[in-house]
Amino acid sequence: MSILSEFKEFAVKGNVIDLAVGVIIGAAFGKIVDSIVADIIMPVVGLVFGKLDFSNLYVVLGTVPAGVANNLADLKKAGVPVLAYGNFITIAVNFVILAFIIFMMVKQINKLRKTHAEAPAAPVAPPEDIALLREIRDSLKRP
């Protein structure tokens, strides 16, 4: 089998196509979650904690050279070691929200699967010869 035909067989398998669809939907879903976090959740969190933008929260771990502005971008550009925990907070909130949304989706999908579960199939009638043998057996058992 040639490499091209093997690749074609691999690429058109159902699992690969399902994976591709999942990746595309996941990318679009990521944008939705980013919007939910940035436009809905973070303003509420900012209202509670008094700050909307957590990305500029940091702790300076070294000495700041003279003439360097005391903001995260300039400190990083100057090579000052900083512990930028604000970006981590934002990413952690994104993760928790994404995990919760995926959990709720999976829960609903499982619920739908249970309600739409196929009824057990009716038992298949035994072949005619088996049915005939059973009748003979039953007639022989009678007194």
Curated annotation (Swiss-Prot):
The chain crosses the membrane at residues 21-41, 44-64, 86-106. One of its GO terms (molecular function) is mechanosensitive monoatomic ion channel activity. The keyword Metal-binding does not apply. It is a multi-pass membrane protein. It comes from the Bacteria. One of its GO terms (cellular component) is plasma membrane. Belongs to the MscL family. Homopentamer. This is Large-conductance mechanosensitive channel.
